Structure formats: C-alpha cells, structure tokens
Amino acid sequence: MPTVGIDHIAMPTANAERLLTFYKRLGFLINNEDAWRQGKVTTFSIQVGESKINVHPEGYTASLRGPTAVPGCTDICFVFEGTVEECQKMLQEAGVTIIRGPEPRAGGRGRCTAPSLSLYARDPDDNLLEWMIYQDMPTAKP
C-alpha cells in the first residue's frame, strides 16, 4: 500500500501559551516556536516522532480544515516506549491527571493484534489524549 503513515494532524487551540506549556512539560519538541512568537509564521507544531501536530492558535483559521475544527475536537493516541509505570510517572511528574487506564486496547500495530495498554488524559483545551504502551513492541507491517 502506497500510504505508509501520517505526516501531521491539525489541532486548534483556545490558548496557545497554555498548550505550549502543557506539551513542553511532557517533553515534546516544539517546531517554529520562535518564528511564531516573532510573528514570522502563523502556526507552530508539536513534534511526535516523525510526525507532527500543527497547532492553530487562537484567531487563526486555516483555509482548509474540518467542519468542526474547534479547540477540544482532537482525539489522539501517542505510542509510549517504556512501561505503563514509566508512562504513569511521566504524566504525574508533568502534573497531568490520568482520567482512565491502564486498560487493554487494540492499536494499529500488527493489524490490531499487538497487545497494548492505554492511559488517558486531557490537555488544557480538553482534547482527549491517549498513551498506548505496546507489550511486545512489534514492528511488523500490514
């Protein structure tokens, strides 16, 4: 299959500063933050592995977007490399409240057959965030 991954998703925010603080506390790298602060670009992004989350700050409306692209509309699952306990510790140290989990889930690896556990939280815009921890970390392609 020629489509092999996700390059980026877009996420609107009601408060860019609050969102930046939240994701930086979790250890994410921010792309174009300085250029955004200087007014050279209209958006910044959160790096996630080889993919990114394009953040649309308050007041910015993308010309191409989903019909319900408003703060809080995003539901995203991150893959965490480590144990459930390490993920819980990372979230707790960042001041993030776990709202559910750990519980078994079927992720995309192994065409939904790889055993995994997930933890759930929300960011400052109330987006649903999931951290999936694969038990065997398989890398088989479909």
Q: In which residue ranges do the predicted regions lie?
A:
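Vicinal oxygen chelate
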Residues: P2, G5-N15, F44-Q47, R65-P142
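Short histidine-centered beta-strand/loop micro-motifs
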Residues: E33-A35, L64-A69, G110-C112
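Active-site/binding-pocket entry motifs
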Residues: K52-I53, T61, T97, P104
